[in-house]
């Protein structure tokens, strides 16, 4: 599950744009949708329908979530979901803690030109954990994997399908399924940090790139106070070690990234390594095709 704590300016602009698009005949989803950066995160507008209620919402793109997620306050107050519509379930937090949540089924979700019916979502107390930084809706893999999606981070557009032109680099990934079924199609990429081999988990809902502290030398580390949290524990400021401008190779793509150092064995990347690129996320082929 993603880590969420950032400034809310991007979501505000997304909602303004979405409201205008629907006022002009609901054509926001005909070909593509705008993307709005917010720190390391990317948001895009969606439309949710539950019964006779139709809601506009800015959704966080999160490759680290198998299911879509609805904030519990938003689910009750805006979607008008009540106890009878919610089923108790369990999921895993980023620290592997088992967390009690609820599930619901939304009648309809319009996302990037495609209508999805009967969308199963997790209902999580995001606002209680991440406070003012919590999104109302998270776009998980169930929607992201339905068709190839082209992310134009230069022009801030999200569209369905392939972009013309040969890819400059094709990144191939592997998947892993959890034993409890809460995590189904996770994206794992081979790479290197410095000169050491790693396997990256791609979590676009994570604020920081993270790597095990034993993979990088002690020289050049900084101490920083950063907000951290997940669905098992509320947001709080922690002192962490950070390494900046680290040479990083993701499959055949080389870049430089900042990393938060952790004691976890799993390395994590957000979309920062793809900044200023145009790429296609294709779950069927298990590829990220970075365009020229």
Regions found by a protein language model. Give the residues of each.
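Bacterial N-terminal signal peptides
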Residues: 14-25
